[in-house]
Structure formats: structure tokens, C-alpha cells
Amino acid sequence: MNKKIFSVLAATLLLANTANAKITMPAIFGDGMLLQQQTEANIWGKTDTMGKKVTITTSWNKKKYTVSADNEGNWKTQISTPHYGGPYEITISDGETLKIKNVEIGEVWLCAGQSNMEMCLWGRRGDVLEGAMDAIVTKASPEIRTFNVPHNMKSAPVYDSKGVWQEANTETLPTFPAGAYFFAKKIHEVLGIPVGLVHTSVGGSSIQAWMSKESMLPFMEDSIMKKHGDKSILFNGMLSSVIGYTIKGALWYQGEANIEEPDLYQKLFPTMVADWRKLWNQGDFPFYYAQIAPFNYHKGGVGKGKNSAYLREAQMKSLDVIPNSGMAILTDIGSDRTIHPQNKEDVGKRFAYLALGKTYGVKGFTTTGPIYKSMSINGNEIELSFDNIDQCLLDWHTGLKDFEIAGEDKIFHPAKAKYNKEKTKIIVSSPEVEKPVAARYAFKDYVQGTLFNNLGLPASSFRTDNW
């Protein structure tokens, strides 16, 4: 009799536990999600039953994956994704069933940074974006989707966010990050592949806020670092909730908050990228970033503190130390009125040119604008050579401006600039400098770039000196 009662009680408890078992997943694994194509995509969640077996079934191939939860109910596995397409469903069960619907397969890009990455198509107070209205009312593809991670500042890493996936349409597009959307739009137009944007950015944020505590340990004794009270707060509160979500690559638009720290930034930036790649465990995935646009940060120029040209230089030099990277140059779209360039379409397109050429193998064009390579001194002239000129250099009939030249006294004077015969090099001189030793181009807070390659991509600001 006791055995019978015990058996009934045990069965009742088992049924109760099964009924109460609830499987949950981070918000990024939700309806409308977009998974990276042709890979082993990470997927994870929780169940409230320790050691419980969890089964994942994917509708595109009817395959079942089984994984056991650990002692805290956490589980994680990988699922094979096909060539792009959809919509599909993913079914997850541990006794209770959870369905993720309207799943697309395509290309996933992480988009991070500060306000110029965050700025959405409807703009912000005082800043209206060029072409935003046209972009919003023009029929958008539902194959372009974004997952916006809400603002969250934390002292320790979080597991989840309250973000949701959204398809691009006239109702949702105003809240899409503008530069990232124009990137996705161009990729979709050229390749015909669905594109998902995992967006995590906060206006005014420093690079320190996006770095893990561990990655910053080598720099903690730096006097500038000690002044930063925002270290890791956005890495913990936002980025950590999507780390491990399988991506194709990353887009980064940040730096304005660090213009006074170019030397430190040049160390932190490659360190951050290396750390993110380590945490994602996807090797050296593509990392493309925007060089900050010119703006009148200080109205003083060189010699009155570290103007933004030094930060642009730090970003340019990072190309040499960050593997599989590229830089979208923006020297022609800055503003003396606002730190937020109104032309986000070219920002997105220039990100796309990098991805199309360097990641997706599209041939026939140079992916970015001219970058200073070397110089030679011939009498009272300096001849400047560049990478990424494509066929030739040009100035859109404005004339070459904002070149400077200096002699051994290290005093820079406005320089006359001209092309060599083939229009592949720039020759600078000044009647004020008989024996030149150094040259600069657009090395100020605010300029309107005048030097381009023949594809219309602008040259980065630069200096040949290290004074």
C-alpha cells in the first residue's frame, strides 16, 4: 500500500515538474530573427529543470539537435544553417515547446558605437538626415531586419536584453540606425541576400565603455584611464547580451568621445577588436569602421590641444595592426555646425563597399579612398604618394586645398598643391619654405576634403611628421 502511494506521488511530482518546466531564450532568439547563413550558428537558452534534455528542430532541414542543460539549467548548441532564404521556424522543446517563427537566413552584422552609429532615420533634435524621407517611404525589403539592444549600463555582464527583431517597412524604418540601414540596403541590392543588423550603440559613449574589464587591465595605470568612470558599463549592459550570436562581421562608428586621447585610443582600439574576436570565437571576422568626420571641436586647430585630426590619424594607423579590417573615410561629409554628419547614406555605402570588396569578393573597384603612403623631397617640393588611388586622383574641380608644408623650423604654411603628370601623386610647395621636411593634408578639426580617387572616395587626412 505504501509502495503504491509512493508510486502515485512520484508520478504526480514528475508530471508537475514537467508541467512547470519552462524553456526561455535571450530576446535575440525571437520571432523575426535572422541567422547567419551556411555556418554552425550558436543557439542557447535556459530551462528550469537541471540536466533536462532540450531538443531543437529546424524547419529548413527537419533536423533535430539534442543538448542537456547544465546544473543551472543553461544549455547551448549549434545548428547548421543553409544557403540564405526563409521564412523558417525553429522549435525548441524540453517537455514544453517554444516556437521561433518567421526566421530568415542571410548575413548578420554587428553594428556598434556612439551617436553617429545610433542616429536613426528620423534624425534627432536639431539634426535632419539627408535622404531620410525618401528612404522611409521607398518600399523596403522585409529581408532587411534589425535587432536594437536597448540602452543599459551595468557593472557586471548581463545575459539578456529587451530588444526585438523588426523588419524594414515604412512604420519601423524611422527607428532603424541610418548608416547601418544604408549599409544593409546596398548589400541586399548587390547580393540579393537578407541582411540582419544587431545594433548596440549609445550617444556620447567612449571606447572604454565598450571594452571588457579584462581587456583593459594592461592600461589601468594610465592617467587618462583612471579618469574614466564609464569603463565597461556598455560592454556589460548591452554588448554582453549578444556576444556569441553568430555574425558575419562588425561595423564600428565611434571616436568622437575620445578625441583628446589619440595616443591611448591607438592602443585601446586594436585591443578591443582582438578581445571581441576572442569572445565571439569566430576567428578574425571582418571589422570595418568609420573614421570620424571633421567637425569644429576646438575652433583653434593644430597647436591648441589634440584636435580631432589626431584621432583620425590613430584610426588610420589602426589599419596596420587590426587584421581583416577596413576604414570608411568621411573627410568630405563633416560639418562645422554639428558633430552628426547629415549624410548617413554615404557612410552606409562606404561600409558596404568595404564589405562587398573585402568580404564578399566583388571585383572591379577600390574599396576605400586614398591613404598616404610615402613622400620624397625634390628641392623645394614634396611629392606625396598614396594607396587606393584606383586610376588617378582628382578634386571635383574645387582645387586642392588644406595642404600644408613645413621646414626644419617645424612651422607649417599653406601649400600650393598640384598633380604629377599621371595624376597619381600630389606635389606641394610654398614660397615660405625653401627646404621642406614635412607635409600635412586636412590635418585640422574641420575641413571639407578636396582630394579623392577617381571613384569619388575621399582621402584620409594625414601628416608626414610626428611632432
Where in this protein do the model-derived segments appear?
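Positively charged n-region of N-terminal signal peptides that target proteins for export
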Residues: 1-4
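Bacterial N-terminal signal peptides
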Residues: 7-16
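Sec/Tat signal peptide C-region and signal peptidase I cleavage site
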Residues: 17-21
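Cell-envelope and extracellular/periplasmic
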Residues: 22-467
